[in-house]
Amino acid sequence: MFKETFAAALLLTFSLTANAGFVKTDWKSSGDSLSVLHEETGKEWLSLTQTDGMSINQVIAQLGNGGTFDGWRLPTASEVEVMLQDSFLGFNLKTGKNTYMAEGYNDAYWKEADTYRKQMGGTDYRVVDGSYWAHSLGFHLDDTGTQLQNSGMNHFNWKATPRLYEFNIMNQVSVDSNNWDASSTYYGVYLISDGGTTLSSKLDPTLNINNPDAPINNVPVAYLLSGLGLFFLSLRRKQSKNR
């Protein structure tokens, strides 16, 4: 209870936004925008562009100390579900393939598709003879850690005149082959961090404060209190000087 109260005080003190959303962060270098923070959960997702074309097994081999994806982990299906639901508010997603059709030159779902593609990273984008395909899809495992699934979205038009658009939101769709060595140019692999992996979260650990498993929430309370006390002391001194 005390830790929760203290975390709330930190949120107010440093004026972090209370609105749930997705904000680009930097993974390795300033300005690379290769990760995204889900503010509501305090967890960060790696851009699918970094795992595009890889299999689950290839990614697993690069997790852990010294690997390409050191500090990242595979998300649970429940974490993917929360991310998808917050990405597509108002769609009332069911588990499986959610399909939406639109006809005419006013593409009803372009905004949602483009936002997600930019947010999570595009895994394929092509324009051929007036038709286009946009994919942002990723492999992950179900909550038992045994079944290969895919989630994300694809958006394309079937024909040019009249235009017929199809928008699919994939929510934990099981891969029939369950082959962990399967890979595709249309798919990446979802990776998530609890904090302290990206450059952004190293520079500002409070980015992950909404995640109870974040490093900032595992710092001894006495240490945090001393830091907060110094902050308020310096604030009081500044106020005294201005009187």
Language-model features and meaning:
Residues 1-4, 237-241:
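Positively charged n-region of N-terminal signal peptides that target proteins for export
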Residues 15-18:
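N-terminal signal peptide c-region/cleavage motif recognized by signal peptidases
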Residues 31-91, 185:
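Short aromatic-cysteine micro-motif
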Residues 176-202:
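Short, structured beta-strand segments at or near domain termini in extracellular proteins/domains
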